[in-house]
Amino acid sequence: MKSEDYTYARMAPDIHEERQYHCEECDQLFESKTELSNHQKYSCGTPHSAFSLVENSFPPILNDDSDLTEMQHAHECKECDQVFPDMQSLEKHLLSHTEEREYKCDQCPKAFNWKSNLIRHQMSHDTGKHYECENCSKQVFTDPSNLQRHIRSQHVGARAHACSECGKTFATSSGLKQHKHIHSSVKPFVCEVCHKSYTQFSNLCRHKRMHADCRTQIKCKDCGQMFSTTSSLNKHRRFCEGKNHFTAGGLFRQGISLPGNTAMDKVSMIGMNHAGLADYFGASRHAAGLTFPTAPGFPFSFPGLFPSSLYHRPHLIPPASPVKGLPGVEQSNKSQSLHVNQPQVLPATQDILKALNKHHSVDENKALEFITENNLNQRPHEKVSDHSESTDLDDVSTPSGSDLETTSGSDLESDIESDKDKLKENGKLYKDKISPLQSLAALNSKREYNNHSVFSPCLEEQTVTGAVNDSIKAIASIAEKYFGSTGLVGLPDKKGTSLPYPSMFPLPFFPAISQSMYTFPERDVRPLPLKVEPESPKESKKVQKGTTESAFDLTTKCKEEKASPNAPSKSSAPTSSKHEQPLDLSMGSRSRATTTKQTESRKNHIFGEKKDIDSELKKTSEHFLQHARPAPFFMDPIYRVEKRKTMDPLEVLKEKYLRSSSGFLFHPQFPLPDQRTWMSAIENMAEKLESFNALKPEANDLIQSVPSMFSFRASSSALPENLLRKGKERYTCRYCGKIFPRSANLTRHLRTHTGEQPYRCKYCDRSFSISSNLQRHIRNIHNKEKPFKCHLCDRCFGQQTNLDRHLKKHENGNLSGTAASSPHSEIEGTGAILEEKEDSYFNEIRNFIGNNSHNKQSPLNIDERINGSHDKIMLTGQNSDILDDDEIEDEAILEDDEESDIDVKVMKEPNASAMLKNCSDEFEEESKSEVNCKVSPSRHDDDDDDEEEDFKKSLSALDHIRHFTDSLKIRKMDDGQFNDAELSPFTASHLTDDLKHPLYRKSKSQTYAMMLSLSDQESMHPTTHTSSSMWHNLARAAAESTALHSVSHV
C-alpha cells in the first residue's frame, strides 16, 4: 500500500494500531512498552536521559528517509572515527576513551592505550608504507600481507579455501592444508609411551606434554635417570656421565670394585655381564679367565667400522700361549669351589687394584679382600662360569635400549647389603691371613709370566677392546679428512722387546724398541676416584709410611723420594741405579739423570728379590680381574669432546704428529724408521709440551689416570664426583625432567611447556619464542634483506643456506654461462685453496723451528737460501752453534709429517719429480765434511756413490712410508743424466700458466723437506758437519743447478 494513494483519513484501519505506544517528546511509535521506555531512557532527549548531553551535540533526528545516511553518522566516535550500528555500542566504546592514554602520537593529538596501536597509527602518517583497504577506507595496514589477509577474511574471498572431502571452508590455504591431515590415514608420528599416532608432529608434541607420569616408564641403565621417550633416552646416553659405565656391570667383569658408587659398592661383583658395553659394542668374545679381550690389534679388514657381529675376530693370545697356563686361571674354570690357595689374580691387574684402593685405609682394604674371598667361595659356580660358557652365542649383539639385557641395579642391592654386613663382622679377621710366602709367590708368578708371555706387560695392559675399535673410526675419519681415504695396512707381528710406553696403535704396529728409549720417572698413574671419603691426617700418614717402599705402591709421594709408581717389583732398600723405573705419567718435573740408569733391569726381575714385601701385595692379588685397567668410554666422533688439559702430552704428540698420510701409515714391505731417533724426539717434544701451563691442571686433580691408546676425553672414573655432577641438577626441566648443558637451552625449552612467545614482531601480529626467529622473520619478510650475494651470477639471497644451495648448482653445471663452468676458474679456485692451506702449514713449521732454535746468529731468509744468492751465504760457521740432538729430532718429526704429504704430490706429477731430482742429489753433498765441500766439481762426480750410501744411512724417521721406492729411484739417479738441454723444458718460459702454480707449490714443499732433512743429517753426523758448511754447500749447489734456478724463478 503506497502512501500517496491513501491519506491518514482514508487509510484503512490498522489492526495493530491499538498496541502502538507513542512518545510524547519525539512523536515516535513503538509496538511495545519496553521499547518506548528504552527510547525515553537513552535515545530521546528527555531530562532523564543518561546521554542527553551527547545527543544535544548531534543534529536533530529526522523522520525522512532521505536523512538515513545522516543518522548513521550520529553513531560515530569523534575520538577514533569509528562508526557503530547503534548507540549502545557507541556508549560501550566511549568508556574505553575515558582511560588514561600514555602513548601519544607526536604528529597528531591522538593518544592510545597500547603501544602497538600507536605504532600502527604512526605507520599511517608515513605515506610510503601504508596500505588502505578499498572496501573500508578507514582500515590502514602497514604490511601488504596484512592487507591481503584482511581482504580474504572480511571481504571478497572470505573463507574461500574449501575442503574437497567435507566442505569445510578456511580463510587461508595453510589452514586448509592443516585440516586435510585429519582425513589422511597416514599417521607417522607415534607416541613412544602409549603408542598413539598423529598426523602432525605438533599434535604429537602437545600430546607428549600431557603425560604426567611417563618419566617413570623408561630408565637409563647407566645413571638411573627417568625419561619419557626412547629418543630422549638415546640423546641422554650420548652425554651421559653416569658412573656405571665404569663399574662392575659396565666395562669390567668379575671382581672389579670402583670407589664412589652407592649402587655398585666396593665389594666385588661376580658373574656380571658386560651390560654397559653390550649396548654399544656387542657382546664380548673372550673366556672368563683371560686378561685380554679378543679383538684383533688392528686387522686388515678394519672391523671397527662395522658391527661386531659381522666379523669373526680371532683371539689375541694363541692357544699355545703360556698365558693360559697361569696359576689360578685354569683352577677358576675347572674347580667348582674356588679356593684361594694361591694367587688367582692376573699380574696385569695388581697395579690397578692398588690404585683403586689407594684412598682407603689398610684395614678397610684387607677387610674388603676378605669379603671378596668369601664371596668367591660361597657363590654358586654357575654364576661364575655363566659368561665363559656362553661363547657360542656371543655373536648375537644386544641392541641399545632393548629388554634383552638383564643387568639392573636392583639385582645387586641384596648382594651388596649382605656384603656390607659381612664386612662389619669379618673386617678384623683378615689381618692374619696373609703371609710373606704367599706374597712372594704372587710376585714370582708375575715375573715368570712377564718373561714368557708373548706380549710385554705394557701391551698386555693396553688391551684392545671394542671401544678402541670404535676410536679407530675417529682416527680414520681424521686421516681421511686431511690425507684421503686410502686406508691403513698393518705390519707383521714383532715378537721382540716391548714398547716402554703405551702404544700409539694396537699391538702389531710398532717394532721392537729398546727399553731405554722412553722412561719417565715421577709420574702418577693412579686413577682418581669419583667420590671418596677423606681420611684423617694420622691414618693417611700411617698408610704412606707403611707403603713407601712396598711393591705396587701407587700412592702420591713427594718428588724428592723418586718413587716408581707402577714398578713390577721393588725391594725395600732405596732405589739404586740398577733398578728400573718404568713409564711415569705424572705431570711433575722429571729428572733425566735417573732415567738413563734404569734401562736394563726389567728382564732380570725373576726370583732374586728380597722377601721384605708388604702384606698389601697379597691383598691386592686376591682380587679377580678380567681387564687390566679402566678404559674410557668411547662415543661416536661427532659427540666426542677433547679435554686437552687432562690429556697426557705424549697423547697430544701422537695425535698431532703421527697421523697417517694419504696412503698407508707404514708400508709392510719396508723396515720401520730409526727407533732411537723417533723415540728421543717424541720424548723431547713431550718435555717441551709439559712446560706450557695449558697442559698443567690445577693441583694435579684432573690428570688422566692411565694413558689410553686413543684418548678423546678423560674417562669418567678419572674425574672427581663434583666435576661429573656439576650442572646436572642445575639445568633440569621441572616439567619433563630433561637436562640441558646451559641455562639458555633450558629457558628456551621451558617455553615449549608454557607456550610463552615473548618476542613479538613490531610490524605484524606474529610472536616468537626465540629471538633469532624474530630477527630472521623481520629481515626476510618485512625488510626484504638479501645480504648473501653470489659472486658468479650476482643473485642475492636472504639466507646462507639458500646461497649454498645455489652455489651447488653452479658446481654441478646446472647453471650455464657462469664462471664456475670454465676449467681455468676451477683450477684457480682449487689452487688458491691448496696454496692457502700449504702456506699456513709451512708458517707453522717455520714458527716451530724458530722457537726451538738456539743459534746465536739469526738464520737467513728461506727464499734467499733457495735462490742461492752468493752475497748472503753464511760463512761464519764458528759463530753459529749447532742444534742439539733433541731439537734436531723435533724438526725431524715435522719433516716426516711434511714429507708424507709431499710424496703423494710428487707421484702425481712425474715431470715435477724428475725436475726436482737434482735438488735432492745436490743436498746429498751437505752430508760431507767442510773439507770435502771445497773439492772441485769433478771430484764431486767421482764421489757420488759414496755420498749416496751415506745419505741412505741418514734417512729420517718416516722415509719408509708410501711411495718410498719411487723416492729412492729419484735419489739414485746421477747428476750427469740431466744436462741443461734436458732441463730446459722445465724453465719458467716453457711452462704453461696452468702448471706454474702447482709446480711452484711442489717445489716449495720439496725445498722445505730437503732443508729439514739437512738438520736430520747433521744430527746423525754431529762430529763431521757444521751448519756453515751445510749452508755453504746448499748455496753452491743451488748456484750450479739449472733446475733449481728454474724452480726459484717460477
Curated annotation (Swiss-Prot):
It comes from the Eukaryota. It is found in: Nucleus; Nucleus speckle. Residues 371-421, 529-612, 928-951 are annotated as: Disordered. The lineage of its organism: Eukaryota, Metazoa, Chordata, Craniata, Vertebrata. GO terms for cellular component: nuclear speck; nucleus. Residues 379-390, 529-542, 599-612 have a biased composition (Basic and acidic residues). GO terms for molecular function: DNA-binding transcription activator activity, RNA polymerase II-specific; RNA polymerase II cis-regulatory region sequence-specific DNA binding; zinc ion binding. InterPro entries: Znf_C2H2_sf (IPR036236), Znf_C2H2_type (IPR013087). A motif (Nuclear localization signal) lies at residues 420-433. The keyword Repeat applies. Its main location: nucleus. A motif (CTBP-binding motif 1) lies at residues 551-555. The keyword Repressor applies. This is MDS1 and EVI1 complex locus protein EVI1-B. A zinc finger (C2H2-type) spans 21-48, 75-97, 103-125, 131-155, 161-183, 189-211, 218-240, 731-753, 759-782, 788-810. The CTBP-binding motifs and the N-terminal group of zinc fingers are required for repressor activity in the pronephros. A motif (CTBP-binding motif 2) lies at residues 582-586. Keywords: Developmental protein, DNA-binding, Metal-binding, Nucleus, Repeat, Repressor, Transcription, Transcription regulation, Zinc, Zinc-finger. Transcriptional repressor during pronephros development. Plays a role in regionalization of the pronephros; may promote formation of the distal tubule and duct over formation of the glomus and proximal tubule. Gene3D superfamilies: Classic Zinc Finger.
